[in-house]
Amino acid sequence: MITKEIIRDKVYELYKEAVIVLGDDVKKSLEDALKKEEHDLAKLNIEAILKNIELAEQKGIPMCQDTGLPVVFVKLGNVKVENLRQGIEEGIKKATEEVPIRPNIVDPLSRKNTNINVGDYIPPIDIELIDENYLEITILPKGFGSENNNAMKMALPAEGIEGIKEFVVESVLKAKGKPCPPTVIGVGIGGTSDLCLKLGKKALLGKVGQRNPDPEIAKLEEEILTEINASGIGPMGLGGKTTTLDVKILKSHTHTAGLPIGVCIQCWADRHATGRIYDD
């Protein structure tokens, strides 16, 4: 039996890791971007980001003051689990108090803060059923400088691949420097209005620099990435070659009359941490 306490402790560890330690794939992408940059301000900004990442790990403190809204992805296998949501919520509360992590969650109308990063329907928990002998939990802290620039379109099927490219590029360029570029762009194609955005967010969990195994999707990722970086928006919107580190796409089948497109923009701090709990 995977108890509530086991889940709580694992979520505490993952949330703490996610806000403090940036993945090696993102760090390498930033280092590679620095080598390619010719713009002085762009170099300065990427150097500052890399130094910030280093200091966060050394001091054990969050890499950004916006520690985001905790988004949780669960893969639930053939295991016995007790009080999953309660365990997740208690782990988030514990990390908020002890790391500490800035409390960001408020009532949308009164703006009163819960002070524990948990609230009505928060954290959002996506559950995927799998045929394995473990419970896997991923924490994605999503900052709202980037989240506020997400976009969704119920495109017509006739708009096709060119319409997808145009909407994604247009959405990122419209955001300019607001999402703290260099960004990572998650794109969801297909499904429904809500599913395409969920897929876009899930796409952010993919390795930066690693292409989609579907050749057609991989080509689309590369084409969108090239177009965005040709804009010259650059790091923090101050000019340069690197507006976006990578574009990640997930697709779903959809209704014959629709082509939903969801664009989820993530700042340079593409933070997430994953852990597994086995039944034994």
How would you name each of these model-derived features?
Residues 1-187, 192-280:
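Non-transmembrane, aqueous-exposed alpha-helical and coiled segments at domain scale
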